[in-house]
Design a protein with these regions (language model features):
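Structural register within alpha-helical repeat arrays
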Residues: 74-75
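TPR/TPR-like alpha-solenoid helical repeat scaffolds
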Residues: 103-115
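Helix-turn-helix repeat elements of alpha-solenoid scaffolds
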Residues: 41-54
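Residue signature of alpha-solenoid helical repeat architecture, marking inter-repeat boundaries
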Residues: 23-27, 66
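C-terminal motif of bacterial Sec signal peptides marking the signal peptidase cleavage site
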Residues: 14-17
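Bacterial signal peptide processing site
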Residues: 19-21
Length: 115
């Protein structure tokens, strides 16, 4: 009987840990849109991706209530390459503010872009 109770308790703990539905970040429809751009980067798809970036940055949801990691950097780099250098650099710097662990990588990227 004791063995049965321990088995049930263990099963309950394991199953309850698998049922977590809360997410740290909200990705909206980032994945299919970014895949479509990677597959065929048409101007229309890039504009759609830019709208997704704006929504991810300006309307963050999820438990952390902040943009997902890498989004500010990706969007900043895209804007920089499209001629919006000042805005792009601001977003790259925001990535560092939000995720200090990205300082080395994003800092080097900023240095390369400013050359």
């Amino acid at each position: 009987m004791k063995h049965y109770l321990w088995s049930m308790a263990l099963a309950t703990v394991l199953l309850s840990s698998c049922s977590s539905t809360s997410k740290l970040y909200s990705w909206y429809n980032y994945e299919p849109v970014s895949y479509a751009v990677a597959k065929n980067p048409t101007p229309e798809r890039i504009e759609t991706l830019k709208k997704v970036y704006e929504r991810l940055i300006n309307e963050p949801k999820g438990l952390r209530k902040m943009p997902p990691p890498g989004i500010c950097a990706e969007y900043g780099y895209l804007l920089y390459k499209q001629g919006q250098q000042e805005r792009g650099l601001r977003l790259l710097e925001r990535e560092i503010e939000l995720y200090p662990e990205s300082t080395f990588f994003i800092g080097n990227l900023i240095k390369q872009l400013k050359k």
